[in-house]
A protein has these predicted regions:
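Glycine-biased, low-complexity coil/linker segments
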Residues: 203-210
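HhH-family (HhH-GPD) DNA N-glycosylase catalytic core used in base-excision repair
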Residues: 1-199
Length: 213
């Protein structure tokens, strides 16, 4: 008898993928994320991915969290040359000077944004009007590298001092944090993500303490 995991159809990873990639596809990718700090952390990681595969970043994610103080923007904004030097000697992360410098700069841009404009998550979600876009793609060939929305997000972030936030990075970010549902229709997660994106049902007024009959 086949186990339930083997019967699931996935879009961009298969049953033979390493456990971290399977778990990321099945539990994280495309789940709507709204927290300001969580979105900032994901944006930083996606910046480190530039030119690399997500598998590389995922395998280093735990060390990234340790090395960058759990992506706490207040701490990151205070990183000095000594701390940056330590990061560039850490084999557990991506040791790219421009990307490390951009992560620190982005922490400062994030804090400046919070002070001037408020909620970072609310701002990012405006590029899909606050509601996840439910795409209906049947092939990986249909997935775009960038869209008008990711172009607009990139422009807005660059204008506010963020770096390593090009349109392609922004679209990968939008896919990952559930702003768009890009699981293929044939993937078991498409319907699950769609249900997660639905607004909660309104509470019924005036009925208390009555169970099913």
């Amino acid at each position: 008898m086949q186990n339930s995991g083997a019967m699931k159809r996935r879009c961009w990873t298969g049953d033979d993928a390493e456990p971290l990639m399977l778990a990321y596809h099945d539990e994280e990718w495309g789940v709507p994320l709204h927290g300001d700090r969580e979105l900032f952390a994901k944006l930083v990681l996606d910046g480190f991915q530039a030119g690399l595969s997500w598998r590389v970043i995922l395998n280093k994610r735990a060390r990234f969290l340790e090395a960058f103080d759990a992506f706490d923007p207040e701490r990151m904004a205070r990183y000095d040359r000594k701390k940056i030097g330590q990061l560039l000697r850490d084999p557990g992360i991506v040791r790219n000077r421009q990307k490390v410098a951009a992560a620190v700069s982005n922490a400062r841009a994030f804090l400046a944004f919070e002070e001037r404009e408020g909620r970072f998550g609310v701002f990012l979600w405006t590029f899909v009007r606050g509601v996840p876009k439910q795409n209906r793609r049947r092939s990986l060939r249909e997935l775009p590298a960038r869209t008008r929305e990711s172009d607009a997000m990139s422009d807005a972030l660059v204008e506010r001092g963020f770096r390593f936030v090009g349109p392609t990075i922004c679209y990968a970010f939008m896919q990952a944090v559930g702003m768009v549902n890009d699981h293929l229709l044939t993937c078991f997660r498409h319907a699950e993500i769609r249900r997660l994106s639905l607004p909660p049902l309104p509470k019924r007024e005036g009925v208390r303490g009555r169970g099913p009959r």
